[in-house]
Amino acid sequence: MSMPLPMKLRTRLFLSISALITVSLFGLLLGLFSVMQLGRAQEQRMSHHYATIEVSQQLRQLLGDQLVILLRETPDGQALERSQNDFRRVLEQGRANTVDSAEQAALDGVRDAYLQLQAHTPALLEAPMVDNDGFSEAFNGLRLRLQDLQQLALAGISDAETSARHRAYLVAGLLGLVGVAILLIGFVTAHSIARRFGAPIETLARAADRIGEGDFDVTLPMTNVAEVGQLTRRFGLMAEALRQYRKTSVEEVLSGERRLQAVLDSIDDGLVIFDNQGRIEHANPVAIRQLFVSNDPHGKRIDEILSDVDVQEAVEKALLGEVQDEAMPDLVVDVAGESRLLAWSLYPVTHPGGHSVGAVLVVRDVTEQRAFERVRSEFVLRASHELRTPVTGMQMAFSLLRERLDFPAESREADLIQTVDEEMSRLVLLINDLLNFSRYQTGMQKLELASCDLVDLLTQAQQRFIPKGEARRVSLQLELGDELPRLQLDRLQIERVIDNLLENALRHSSEGGQIHLQARRQGDRVLIAVEDNGEGIPFSQQGRIFEPFVQVGRKKGGAGLGLELCKEIIQLHGGRIAVRSQPGQGARFYMLLPV
């Protein structure tokens, strides 16, 4: 048995709507035809009855005229004859035009009564009317006949109105039945369409729910609707493709997750992953050992298992998408009764759409590193103190020796003496830098704070370096914001920071370059920046540039302590210093000082 060809949804809807429209038009035409027929019949009947009333009125008028003629002293026979002829003519016209049998019989009665009246009329021309009783009876009989005719016509009009009203009710009932039929047909059609089209769609929806739950063994409905059938076939193809994809890809995904889990668990740093609600999704063994010890962190918030306020605030900021742009103080934790120092940093994880989806906390045990740095600082301090006295003595002795020696200016000996003097001066500066660095590292350096005018401070710094810039053909521009406040600063130390930044900018600027010395207020802080368009700083070096003994760029100078000293000075003032740079496009060092 062959399955009927599927009919398109558009065709089904067209046929259903066409059937409704056809029934509606049939009912409308039937109503119009009935109303027109009713009106035409009513008009004909009313016109006939009104014509009868008009005939009755004319006959009564003519009868009255004849009576007036007969009542005269000398009746006018000719006038009477004309009136009689008119009476007969009107009567015959009425009889000819009437279609109602009752009215026809009434008109016949009027004719007979008038003939009787005419039989007594000649005698009236010779004797008075009062002496003729037969005429009076005939006249009264005719008058009553005319009254009956008029009453009959009025009754016909009333009957016609009643009949028209009944027929109108009938037409209204028929139209109501047609309307009910249309509603029933529409309801049945809509229900049929909804059942035929809704059932397979509901089945597809249930199948989609099962697929969403991971069950791909679904039964799809068969239908003879072309569009729904096509949708069902494509849905089946999709389900089969998903089944195959799951079969081939789930293991790969799980394998990839296991590999990623192994990588996260094998790195030396502690790693904690937060979801967008601040709850811990994953912590590798190193992080659990360093931070949480005996607590299971999964599903908990950081403030439930770690009391450090800085870490809690940093997690909240990272979940808001804020990037941590400065080093945070080491985290002190107690592990197996031993105090450990952990360096940590937080990184927000954002969706391509821009909203936050979580954060990542990275921790590293720096206990040994900090101990080494402390030993190094102590060694540098002691070595600097031990070296400063003999080196200073050697420099003074060499200066006295140089004054006693007299070599020609162009001689080899003069060049050697000049080289030794420069290197000894450089060595003294290095020892002084080491001493200063050690003082800052050990907290021995104290600030001498005083109210400072930033405009005057930066203007003098510009004036100090303009000659050096002109010698290198580098322009130095000062850009000051409005209403810079006075700050409590150690002016000598801040001048040292600005001079160091300007010196570095000059060293790394090409001929024809530009340096901008800027200052402006930002809320409760003042930003001071030195920006150049020189060679820039490689990305790999930007994170280490403020570490001691680190030098970057092709042009070296000093011992690599300048930026470390700048950082220490700014931190003592309660501020911070940072850098932004694009290799080949220059660098911008900026510091933020509290107001």
From Swiss-Prot:
Compartment(s): Cell inner membrane
Gene3D superfamilies noted in UniProt: 1.10.287.130, HAMP domain in histidine kinase, Histidine kinase (KinB), sensor domain, Histidine kinase-like ATPase, C-terminal domain, PAS domain
UniProt cross-references to SMART domains, sorted A to Z: HAMP, HATPase_c, HisKA, PAS
UniProt PTM: Autophosphorylated.
E.C. code: 2.7.13.3
Xref: PROSITE patterns: HAMP, HIS_KIN
Cytoplasmic side: 1-12, 189-595
Catalytic reaction list: ATP + protein L-histidine = ADP + protein N-phospho-L-histidine
Protein name, per record: Alginate biosynthesis sensor protein KinB
Modified residues (Phosphohistidine): H385
GO CC terms: plasma membrane
Biological role stated in the UniProt entry: Member of the two-component regulatory system AlgB/KinB involved in regulation of alginate biosynthesis genes. KinB functions as a membrane-associated protein kinase that phosphorylates AlgB, probably in response to environmental signals.
Domain Histidine kinase: 382-595
Taxonomic classification: Bacteria, Pseudomonadati, Pseudomonadota, Gammaproteobacteria, Pseudomonadales
Listed result of changing N504Q: Loss of autophosphorylation
InterPro entries named among the record's database cross-references: 2C_sensor_his_kinase, HAMP_dom, HATPase_C_sf, His_kinase_dom, HisK_dim/P_dom, HisK_dim/P_sf, KinB_N_sf, KinB_sensor_dom
Result of changing D532E: Loss of autophosphorylation
Keywords: Alginate biosynthesis, ATP-binding, Cell inner membrane, Cell membrane, Kinase, Membrane, Nucleotide-binding, Phosphoprotein, Sensory transduction, Transferase, Transmembrane, Transmembrane helix
Catalytic EC class: transferase
Residues annotated as transmembrane: 13-33, 168-188
Pfam families associated with the record: HAMP (PF00672), HATPase_c (PF02518), HisKA (PF00512), KinB_sensor (PF16767), PAS_4 (PF08448)
Organism, scientific name: Pseudomonas aeruginosa
